[in-house]
Amino acid sequence: MIRNYIAVFLIIPYLACAQTENKSATYKENNAKIQVEMDNVIRPAMQEFNIPGVAVAVTINGENYFYNYGFASKETQQPVSSETIFEIGSISKTFTATIAAYAEVNGKLSFSENVSKYLPALRGSAFDKVSVLNAATHTTGGLPLQFPDEIIDNNQAIKYFKTWKPKFEAGTQRSYSNPGTGLLGMAAAASLDQPFEKIMEKTIFPALGMMHSYITVPQAQMKNYAYGYSKTDEPIRVNPGPLASEAYGVKSTANDMIHYVDAHLQLLKLDKKLQTAIQNTHIGYFKIGEMTQDLIWEQYPYPVEVSQLLAGNSSKIIFEDNVATKISPPVKPDANVLINKTGSTNGFGGYVAFVPARRIGIVILANKNYPITARVTIAHHILNQLDRLAPLKAK
C-alpha cells in the first residue's frame, strides 16, 4: 500500500510538469501564429495612416497575448509596451454603462425610470420623459454628438439640458451622443451618492483588477502615458470638455483592457454583483439595421461578416439619426454574438471586440485617430485567426 502511495506522489509532479510544458508549448505555438498575422495587418496600417505606435492584446480562453509596435512618443522614441497608457475615447462609455448596471444590481438605479428622477435639477425639463435606458442606448430623442462649443463645463451642461428640446420621441431614433452618455453617468453616480470619478477609480477599476487605468493619470504614471498625434502630426493629449469623464475620459493599457475583456467573457473571479452588472450590459434593447444596441455595447450574431461590422460602425451610424426598433422583450445576453465598441480622441484610436461563445477577444490601441474601417477590418481578420486557435470546447 505504501509503495502505491509513493508511486502516486511521484507521478503527480510529473503529470503537472508535463501539462505545464504542454500548455507552454501551445502558448508559444499560438503566439508565433498570431504574431505573423498581426505583423501582416498592423505594420501596413501603421505605414498607411502614419501611426506612431500600436498596442494589441488578444485573449483565447483566458490566455493573453501581447503585440507592441512603434513608439509611445516620437520625440523620446519610448517604445510601446503592454503597460503604455492610451486614451481609449468612447470605449470609456462601456465603463459608464457598467457603473449604471452596477447601480441597478445594487437596487439604487432603475433603467425604466426617467433621468430627472436622479437629477433633480432637470425636473420639469424634457428629461421627465427620457429614461435612463434611453441615455444608455443613444435613444434620448436626438441629443447631439457633442455639446455646442459654448458649453465648456458641467454646470453649463446642466443648463443646456434644462432647455434642450427633443427632435424625436425618446426610444424611436438612435442618435450617438456624448452628452447622452454624460447624462447616464451623472444619473448613475447620483444614485450611488458618490462622484463619478471616485466610483470609477476607487470601485470599478480595482474590482476589475485594472491597476493602471485612470480618468486622471497620476504624476507617477505620466512616464507611461503615450502622446497622441493629430492630423498634422503634432503631439497632443485630450483636453477634457463637459462630462468628459463619463463619455471619453478613461486612459488605460492593453494589459488592463484585455483583462476587462476577460471579465466580459466570464473568465475572471469577480464580485458576484459586478459580474452580473457586466453581463447585463450585453442585454439587447434596440435594432438599428443589423446591429443590436446593448447598454452602450453594440452586438451582431456570430459568425459575422466584416461588411456587417463596417456598416454598424459607419459614419452614418455615428453621425446621423437612425431608426431604432425596440426589442420587446429585450434580448438576454447571448454567447453567440460579437460585441464591439470603437473609441477615439483627437490623438488616439481604439477598438475592442469579443465573442463570448468562443471566449476570444481583441483590444487595439493606437496613438493616432486613424479610420475606424481599418480598425474593424484588422480586428475581424485577427478574430478569425483566434477562432481557429480557440479550443472546440471552452474550459
Q: What is each stretch, according to the model?
A:
Residues 37, 44-55, 75-134, 166-180, ...:
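Short active-site loop at a secondary-structure junction
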Residues 75, 156-167, 228-242, 329-336:
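The feature captures the short pre-catalytic strand/loop hairpin that immediately precedes
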Residues 1-26:
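Bacterial Sec-dependent N-terminal signal peptides
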Residues 33, 37-44, 90, 95, ...:
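Extracytoplasmic/secreted proteins, especially bacterial periplasmic and envelope-associated proteins
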Residues 17-69, 189-194, 198-201, 206, ...:
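Catalytic loop of the DD-peptidase/beta-lactamase superfamily, centered on the K-T-G motif
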Residues 87-91, 103-143, 147, 163, ...:
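Active-site helix/loop module of the DD-peptidase/beta-lactamase fold
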Residues 67-69, 145-150, 215-219, 374-376:
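Short, solvent-exposed loop/turn and secondary-structure capping segments
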Residues 24-31, 85-87, 120-123, 145-148, ...:
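Second-shell loop/turn segments in exported
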